[in-house]
Amino acid sequence: MLFRSITDNMSVMLDCSSTALFIARRIKDRKNLTIITNSLEILIELKDAKNLKIFSSGGLLGEDSFALVGNQADRMISEFHVNASIISCKGFDIDKGFTDSHDMHASTKRVMLENCDTRVLAVDSSKFNHIAFNVVGTLSDIDVIVTDVKPPKEWAERFEKAKVECLYPADAEEAAK
């Protein structure tokens, strides 16, 4: 569902999450796609893709991760404007927003969301009702949530009120009935 919305000739930012790596693997056959990422894993995954233009953010190699972060990464990312930024998070709480465990990762994710037309949070249900240390943003900071299950009714109502589109697999809706 999310993969179909990433089409040829688009520009996309992907963060350093395992979710973004999964997405990168699914879209590397697109034509004339420009990808900007701070993930070393995504750079390695896409290095042989023939029809992609790939930009690395540069920056400081993050502790305990394959992410490039810090002021240099944020500054480079802020020099671009893309069709969509796709990020993930360590926790998502309907009241507190979406969070990350590292301050520099959170900063880079915020910069990605500031420099795009469509702001996408890709978050699996295991992150629901969890709060990590650093706030990345709230519902007002995203346009689309992509998840693996139909959200609880209260959450769906909050998404609708905030004008956030929620995408989940059709079979998740059937399972919720």
Residue ranges and their predicted role:
Residues 9-27:
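Conserved H-X4-D acyltransferase segment
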Residues 14-15, 37, 147:
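Short beta-strand scaffold positions
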Residues 1-2:
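Short, small-residue-biased leader/transition segments that mark boundaries at the very start
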Residues 18-21, 41, 153:
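Short alpha-helical
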Residues 26-34, 51:
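Conserved S-adenosyl-L-methionine
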